[in-house]
Amino acid sequence: MANTLHKVERLDKKKIIEKMFAGGSRSFSVFPLRVVYLPVEELEADASILISVSKRRFKRAVKRNRVKRQIREAYRVNKHELLNALAEKKCRLAIAFIYLSDQLTESSVIEERVKTALARIVER
């Protein structure tokens, strides 16, 4: 399995995103991330992700983009365990990673937290 993040693995359907945040989804926090996920059958990929960094916390787009890049990279490297579990269960998930902190965080810390979050999703 390749370590790439394809376009179909990015969540961009407005209808699914609205459904995720309107209710019916599950969520938990692994500071500095809040993870919201929802089983959705109409996705093309087994897991599609959305990454959000608040403009209120980081005024500069450069910093927001850095955080998004760190989360995306951590997910890309560690997604295999999640994808294997989803293939076993024949389930598809929409996952949103929301960055909560107002401080920049090292990539190693974010990767550790993303691993923890993915493990918790696999448990449930």
Give the predicted meaning of each segment.
Residues 1-124:
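Positively charged, solvent-exposed patches that mediate nucleic-acid binding
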